[in-house]
Amino acid sequence: MAQLVEHNLAKVGVAGSSPVVRSKRNSPTTTVAGLFLYLSPRLEPERGRAFWVVAVALFAANVRFGRIIVGISHNLVAREIRPMATEKSSSRSWMSDAAIYQIYPRSFKDSTGSGLGDIAGITQQMDYLERLGIEAIWLSPFYPSPLVDGGYDVADYCDVDPRLGSLDDFDDMIAAAHARGIKVIVDIVPNHSSSQHPWFKAALAAGPGSPERARYIFRDGRGEHGELPPTNWNANFGGPAWTRVADGQWYLHMFTPEQPDFDWSCPEVHALFCDVLAFWSDRGVDGFRIDVAQGLAKDLDRDDLDRWHLAEGDDMVDDGTHPLWDRNEVHEIYREWRRVFDRYNPPRSAVAEAWVLPERQYLYARPSELGQTFNFEFAKATWTYDDMHTAIEKGLKAAVESDSAST
């Protein structure tokens, strides 16, 4: 699976928004299936040197390059080096060695002159995408959304934002992609919904103790009149992680107040997302990128919650007992999803965006679960030989342990 580092490499001094390097695997044990970097169209000298640090580190990890595709921004220019003879490896998802192009629909191509990119615009550019030599496109969220968080605040998981088109437009886009041998990946956001989702509106209207409220994480406050939040946590995007509603209860939001967290102990939440995955799979979607994959299962009934931090990556433990992140129970969810994926021929693929300790990455990438996970050690590593070498080695180790491909 080509590494899709999204916006994270911007934090370490690399700007831009498109896949740059792809390497094709040669064997299960000496593999870097692909590395997606985000480079500025005009590389400054130090950033150019950083590129070669990556290349040297890859070779140092005993990786033999196969085909390499290099591209810059949306105006991606492809070049191909013929692959070397490769050993036959174990069967894995097509994602394992695909060149994947991320599209943010609202900025990619405007087909109507509205000033906003849309689904039909992607269809219009399908010949261009085919010429690049890519094998799949990954669409950032295109669902109805208030856009508090770039579309990751979803108000309806089974529709297209009317500003971007319709389900008919989506079907046309899928057909155009498949006609050219291009697969389609979409984002799924299962940790939270938009506060404008019908379920959350129903939860606010129904009141404490209702089945509607059980779909989200509502708690009574502390203090004599419940005026204090249930815990002392701050959200990942800043500010308190709890918001109080009119009847006095508080709801949890790991990111923004407009993104209330689902309660995954509720069977209705499980059923909703199995239906969502089937809905898009039935329409021809080939794969799913799972947002905040490590954050679904939570334990808020323990007595020591105030000593933990909500921010991703803080206080991480290696035994799956953190109350908020990377809990062992999350893997029951993904085994359930794998049963949905495997109903299709070919089975649908998935990749986890899971910010977890390197030694636990492989759990998400097991064939019985999502099958792939991003190796964010690349995003966190400094642009030095030692750091990149270590990140690659950790990724290869996780790949061997999970019978998946390194990302």
Predicted regions span which residues?
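Short, positively charged low-complexity motifs
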Residues: 3, 16, 24-27, 34-35, ...
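Extended, structured, electrostatic nucleic-acid-contact surfaces
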Residues: 7
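Hydrophobic, Leu/Ile/Phe/Ala-enriched alpha-helical segments that form helix-helix packing faces
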Residues: 16, 337-341, 395, 399
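Acidic/aromatic-lined carbohydrate-recognition and catalytic surfaces
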Residues: 85-278, 282, 295-358
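Hydrophobic residues within beta-strands of alpha/beta enzymes
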Residues: 137, 288-290
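Noncatalytic carbohydrate-binding groove/subsite architecture in carbohydrate-active enzymes
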Residues: 354-407
